[in-house]
């Protein structure tokens, strides 16, 4: 039995709107707001008049802000919680809104706020207590007589005469009704004077006619009294276990050995107060005795049931581990999706920046990705299977090679996903700029983050996986230097050459081999030289570095692709220290937003109107010169500033005559890398819109074009259009045919034309019947084909695993020199080799990246096999192996050992980003930075 729950309600119905991660943004609906206190926890309960389960929000240590808008009409209050949920209440009574704001402000400060009984509900029009007050005077005498369970009526004041609690239909042991009333009156006075804690009886929670006083203190006393009585009953039973004891008044449930007597009509308060009792002792009709099987008391002297902790409202049971179903040779897709979804920064940037999903086309990959990501942990396998089909269809609409059920390469699928997601974000930014969304609310009532319609949405691929490499080409004849910059989402590295005299090579060796300096054939524009050297350095680092290990080689003699089963060490940490410069930019911070960075960049550009944004080119003292093949950072900022302030061009001319004006350039040194990226995004959006032209429509793939006002109703809208278009087309066809008939017909009157119309109608009906039959037959064939494909998939998986097991001994014996025969080996000094070996376990060197996921290909052939993925779960702080629908726990050492021959794609996260995410997960803090969460529909 729990303590009483004081409640604060809104009285009448109010308009309510909720924004949270589970619902998105709901519409305005009428309902009731209640604030409950239970076990020192305060919750907000929202009940909608339209029905459905009530919504519960925790208020204890969760209130972020309370806003009260006092307008000419009804009052509006906005409650913002720390878990990114927002509850908006409209049409509140002035007094109710005032009291509710005071209470919520008290909860926000962490002070205890409990409703007092002397602050009754009449003071501000709210309801206190467990239920609505009911007037007892409205009950008829027969109603009062037929309520034997209302024993709590005895605790009221004796201002009115009482009716006996017995029912005329039951047999009673009392001689007369009048004498029973006198006995009860006397017992009532004695019990009220001696044992006041029994005045609030247990059956009161079922009594609809009881008063609505706040009974917190009395209920606590009653519970303590019941607990003491239960202890005493257990002690008596333990001292005399074999002696049948009569029903004692100190026993809460009664004696185990007492005979069942349902003919007695006395209530719990009518039991005699003496320790001895006659065999006809009365038993409560509400509280069952111990002989009832389902009311057995646990054999303990210290019963702690009253203080049993209740589960938290926000505490949700962890769902079982489950993967993705195989739709038919789609293991490559499942492995890549699991690796991408395991990246917290990627998931947050995809879901928690408030993308208006209704404005995104239904079949866009961005929307399909977000929908699957949001539902993958809470949906059954059947629902996820359908979501996977939609993701596959969105990919296949652009890349037809992924349609059907053929086996595909996991790296090709990954590259297609990342490129297509980038395109979708660019399209939505462009459509959002050209067609701002209109809200149905006045501007004064919108939230701050809903007003801005010119924002830029951050691309999850750009801020997480994309990095920039600077290629430095140096002419060997004249020393001229040309700089080229190139953006990548991943790197494809070669297998290091394996020899008997060398130890086992690692992924670090392959990465260093990729960035080695090399000689190329190059035609110099200055001296017409034909040879040059090129070196590669990182100019911007990613949060997540994706490495693709080339395990396939083409056999020219057999004209076949073969898989290399060479062992490669998988280090826990990689370092890019030797491939970075002093100007290399670090990964973007977790809270970075393209919109915020662009706003700050534009403010800085507006504050300086006459400064130059171009640095003096630094030429080396040698005879060589430096050319930049891409826009420098200063040029990018210059273009953005020139877009907003065309007068800056004149300032550049003045700068040539007034060198002292260059001092003001230092104000632009505050523009960091993140703001620079925002400037690039803004400039690219502007250039794209200019290049497209006013009459040119943006090109898009089938079913993924942008421009629909409401993608949620897109399917229904298309169905309505098809339904309306069909008879229209028939009429147009009919009109054209009739026109031709009029030109060729003979003047035989109207009868020939009517016969032709009737014949056309019959042909139309026959065609419709044939079409329906063809559709039904195609559906049956599709179902049969899917069943055959499932069987073929099972057989293919079994054969692939069997082939891998049979070829494993051969692989173990033939990998001594199976690496890249034409490649070069990295040569390290002893100190460098020891430093790299130590860093592989500790990650102490700067710009180190930690292993977080491995996609492996199991099988000896490049044309067959099976893909699985091992990922590090940030929330569980453990490694998981995803094999389609099967999920199992594993260890990092096991992954490093078992995937040294089959590892194909490796995901490494920057050490600083990894540690920051780990700390946030341990602290239970959301990494969305308070951004709006809109779930895809």
Swiss-Prot record:
Motif KEN box 3 in this chain: 742-744
Q: List all membrane-crossing ranges.
A: none
Q: Where is this motif: D-box 2?
A: 101-110
Mark out the compositionally biased spans (Polar residues): 132-149, 609-625
- Which residues of this protein are catalytic? 331 (nucleophile), 866 (proton acceptor)
MF terms (GO), sorted A to Z: cysteine-type deubiquitinase activity; cysteine-type endopeptidase activity
Ranges for the USP domain? 322-911
User: Where does motif KEN box 1 map?
Assistant: 38-40
Bias (Basic and acidic residues): 151-161
Which parts of the sequence form the motif D-box 1?
Answer: 76-84
The record's Gene3D superfamilies line, in alphabetical order, gives:
Cysteine proteinases, Ubiquitin carboxyl-terminal hydrolase 26/29/37, pleckstrin homology-like domain
Question: What EC number(s) would the UniProt record show?
Answer: 3.4.19.12
Protein role:
Deubiquitinase that antagonizes the anaphase-promoting complex (APC/C) during G1/S transition by mediating deubiquitination of APC/C target proteins, thereby promoting S phase entry. Specifically mediates deubiquitination of 'Lys-11'-linked polyubiquitin chains, a specific ubiquitin-linkage type mediated by the APC/C complex.
Name assigned to this protein: Ubiquitin carboxyl-terminal hydrolase 37
**Which source organism does the UniProt entry give?**
Danio rerio
Query: Which gene is the coding source of this polypeptide chain?
Result: usp37
